[in-house]
């Protein structure tokens, strides 16, 4: 599973591109001012977080679940837990804005964590209203910390929790890179924090004289990191002599089901789309014990674990009489958490389509609707902390996200047989059935922190 965000920070004359995608990388010990610092065991006092500007919250922002009992995972920093919850709030809000702009028959897939990380890296260089809007839109201001600079420390700790797993049966890794124009001197503090917190080293390129070669170099780096899954992520003419910086955040996940679907049980069945039309999908099948619950208005919630149990796929399937669009509009982080808390293990018959989703879209319109206005404005954007000497003519001209998900009998991104055989299915009328033969929501989450890594909807699994 991959997710990719490309954005452009531009000035009156120069641009900065933001790329957030899902690919392969590692979180390691980095060097800051000559001293090796392992970000995963460091204390706040060990890490100098001194961006050019700091946003100070006037008061703690009330949240929907304030006052309720918080079940914070063992050995988890409270602020890291709150950052994970902030990501969930951004995820559901952004998804609703995106779904409103799409046709009900369109598949959707994205990584809210990837998007948040890319814009957190941008926030390092932001000031004034631009910084405040980034804090508010990405829900960073809901964290019980009065200053914006500490968000980066908590991001580092969250990354350590997510990406430094000993489990070898599922792979969740991340990489970041800054590609900067070689003619410019970048703010030293911006570079230091980007590398220390996000592992994003600066690689100089010649955007001014060799824009096309620079584009090819970045695309090649992305292709290599994704094992060739994502190519030409930056389209022709997207980089030119005005480009200043390309920021790349990447996340990649590959997992095998804890309980695999047998290819011999896969057969063609009708999938009923939102518009009333149907298509022929390869429907997988298995019986087993899974965490499941029928919740409000007959909506079914099913959790399928990957090997290792730390990462799971959650499917939300409305009853046939209720549209998925209605569920999407009603979904909040609190509702989702309530549903997950109610799941119970039981014997289940699962019918689920084999599918592959590739999605790509601009983030600009949805983020502007959510209140991130100044960052995209040549007149209002304040990003003086990126280039040396406080240059203040940069803005984000656009931001794009690309994502990829493939699910089959083996799990995610695994090679599997293409044989379709009608055999091996049992009929047990006493067991609960989860049959995803109509549009459903999909989440991939890290269980202990309930971090939403990916989310989307499967509206048409028949798309090639």
Swiss-Prot record:
<dbReference type="InterPro" id="IPR023795">
    <property type="entry name" value="Serpin_CS"/>
</dbReference>
<feature type="glycosylation site" description="N-linked (GlcNAc...) asparagine">
    <location>
        <position position="187"/>
    </location>
</feature>
<feature type="glycosylation site" description="N-linked (GlcNAc...) asparagine">
    <location>
        <position position="167"/>
    </location>
</feature>
<dbReference type="GO" id="GO:0005615">
    <property type="term" value="C:extracellular space"/>
</dbReference>
<dbReference type="InterPro" id="IPR042185">
    <property type="entry name" value="Serpin_sf_2"/>
</dbReference>
<feature type="modified residue" description="Phosphothreonine">
    <location>
        <position position="63"/>
    </location>
</feature>
<keyword id="KW-1015">Disulfide bond</keyword>
<dbReference type="GO" id="GO:0004867">
    <property type="term" value="F:serine-type endopeptidase inhibitor activity"/>
</dbReference>
<keyword id="KW-0597">Phosphoprotein</keyword>
<feature type="disulfide bond">
    <location>
        <begin position="40"/>
        <end position="160"/>
    </location>
</feature>
<feature type="glycosylation site" description="N-linked (GlcNAc...) asparagine">
    <location>
        <position position="224"/>
    </location>
</feature>
<keyword id="KW-0646">Protease inhibitor</keyword>
<keyword id="KW-0722">Serine protease inhibitor</keyword>
<keyword id="KW-0325">Glycoprotein</keyword>
<comment type="subunit">
    <text>Forms protease inhibiting heterodimer with TMPRSS7.</text>
</comment>
<feature type="site" description="Reactive bond">
    <location>
        <begin position="425"/>
        <end position="426"/>
    </location>
</feature>
<feature type="binding site">
    <location>
        <position position="81"/>
    </location>
    <ligand>
        <name>heparin</name>
    </ligand>
</feature>
<keyword id="KW-0964">Secreted</keyword>
<comment type="similarity">
    <text>Belongs to the serpin family.</text>
</comment>
<dbReference type="InterPro" id="IPR036186">
    <property type="entry name" value="Serpin_sf"/>
</dbReference>
<keyword id="KW-0094">Blood coagulation</keyword>
<dbReference type="InterPro" id="IPR023796">
    <property type="entry name" value="Serpin_dom"/>
</dbReference>
<dbReference type="GO" id="GO:0007596">
    <property type="term" value="P:blood coagulation"/>
</dbReference>
<dbReference type="GO" id="GO:0042802">
    <property type="term" value="F:identical protein binding"/>
</dbReference>
<dbReference type="GO" id="GO:0030193">
    <property type="term" value="P:regulation of blood coagulation"/>
</dbReference>
<feature type="disulfide bond">
    <location>
        <begin position="279"/>
        <end position="462"/>
    </location>
</feature>
<keyword id="KW-0358">Heparin-binding</keyword>
<feature type="signal peptide">
    <location>
        <begin position="1"/>
        <end position="32"/>
    </location>
</feature>
<protein>
    <recommendedName>
        <fullName>Antithrombin-III</fullName>
    </recommendedName>
</protein>
<dbReference type="Pfam" id="PF00079">
    <property type="entry name" value="Serpin"/>
</dbReference>
<feature type="disulfide bond">
    <location>
        <begin position="53"/>
        <end position="127"/>
    </location>
</feature>
<feature type="glycosylation site" description="N-linked (GlcNAc...) asparagine">
    <location>
        <position position="128"/>
    </location>
</feature>
<keyword id="KW-0732">Signal</keyword>
<feature type="binding site">
    <location>
        <position position="161"/>
    </location>
    <ligand>
        <name>heparin</name>
    </ligand>
</feature>
<dbReference type="GO" id="GO:0008201">
    <property type="term" value="F:heparin binding"/>
</dbReference>
<dbReference type="GO" id="GO:0002020">
    <property type="term" value="F:protease binding"/>
</dbReference>
<feature type="modified residue" description="Phosphoserine">
    <location>
        <position position="68"/>
    </location>
</feature>
<dbReference type="InterPro" id="IPR000215">
    <property type="entry name" value="Serpin_fam"/>
</dbReference>
<dbReference type="InterPro" id="IPR042178">
    <property type="entry name" value="Serpin_sf_1"/>
</dbReference>
<dbReference type="InterPro" id="IPR033829">
    <property type="entry name" value="Antithrombin_3_serpin_domain"/>
</dbReference>
<comment type="function">
    <text>Most important serine protease inhibitor in plasma that regulates the blood coagulation cascade. AT-III inhibits thrombin, matriptase-3/TMPRSS7, as well as factors IXa, Xa and XIa. Its inhibitory activity is greatly enhanced in the presence of heparin.</text>
</comment>
<keyword id="KW-0356">Hemostasis</keyword>
